[in-house]
Design a protein with these regions (language model features):
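Gly/Pro-rich cap/lid or specificity-loop segments adjacent to the active site
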Residues: 58-142, 149, 153-165, 170-174
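Alpha/beta-hydrolase
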Residues: 173, 178-265
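A short loop-to-beta-strand scaffold at the N-terminal edge of the catalytic core in hydrolase folds
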Residues: 30-42
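A domain-start/cap signature at the N-terminus of enzymes
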Residues: 4-25, 35-37
């Protein structure tokens, strides 16, 4: 494995941590829940050099690996980096890959649930009870803020990069516009269409002109974070009423104001 600077180090193949039936904060359960991850670097004997790096919106753990290095965000020659796929990204348990709760049968989940699943991965599957740092970019930053709130003593440092505890009004407007584009597709059929509308580039409305501006050029299938977004509506994160008054809130964390420190570790 080589990073963006051309440096080479060992990086694990994609691994999965099995959580069994994972209970969510709303009381629902993700059956046979699995969390995917890659690792880079060497774990110290006392496990004191762990850095957890959750994915951004539409991101995968594999896409994070090239961002590490001696001139990157974190140096695997010093730290054992765990790049973790967030719930719903199409690699960890998601509406698109669940055999027991596919599409609209998949339960509603939150940023807090993502963090709780990562906590269980670390403590139950990997035997890690304290980490040096948690860090994340964009929605990974949102997860970082939630880590600070949910497990403040679990890490020594928290680094949120271009992330915020809550979505802005602009973000919410963007998702609502894309949600409308999905719902207006003639094949929508309440989220159980045989072929989902395209989420990147042009959405498949009757006129095929609704343009999605987030994630253009992605080389992998769309991710499905939260409920009430275009991803949720296409792949079915829970059962969603189509009326606007019943639309779900966008993902957000418990955190209100926490300082971020995007310095290199």
């Amino acid at each position: 494995m080589r990073n963006a600077q051309g440096e080479s180090w060992h990086s694990s193949e994609l691994k999965f941590g099995d959580l069994g039936d994972f209970k969510l904060e709303n009381g629902a359960v993700i059956r046979d829940c699995r969390i995917a991850y890659h690792t880079s670097g060497k774990l110290n004997d006392d496990k004191s050099n762990v850095v957890l790096w959750p994915t951004w919106f539409t991101g995968s753990s594999k896409q994070l690996i090239p961002l590490a290095g001696s001139d990157g965000y974190v140096d695997p020659s010093r730290y054992f980096v765990i790049f973790v796929d967030a719930l719903g990204n199409g690699i960890s348990s998601s509406p698109s890959n669940s055999s027991v709760q596919p599409r609209m049968e998949f339960p509603v989940f939150t940023i807090r649930d993502m963090v709780n699943s990562q906590y269980r991965l670390l403590t139950e599957n990997l035997g890690i009870n304290h980490i040096h740092a948690v860090m994340g970019i964009s929605m990974g930053g949102m997860q970082t803020f939630q880590w600070i709130v949910s497990y403040p003593e679990f890490m020594d440092k928290a680094v949120a990069i271009v992330g915020s505890p809550r979505l802005t009004a602009y973000d919410m407007l963007l998702w609502r516009a894309e949600e409308s584009a999905i719902r207006e597709d003639k094949d929508w059929n309440g989220g159980v269409a045989d072929v989902a509308p395209r989420l990147f580039g042009f959405c498949r409305t009757d006129e095929n002109q609704a343009r999605s501006v987030d994630g253009a050029g992605s080389d992998r299938r769309p991710c499905e974070f939260g409920r009430g977004t275009l991803f949720a509506l296409t792949f079915g994160v829970g059962k969603t009423n189509s009326s606007s008054k019943n639309s779900q809130k966008m993902p957000q964390t418990d955190a209100q104001l926490v300082y971020s420190a995007p310095n290199r570790m």
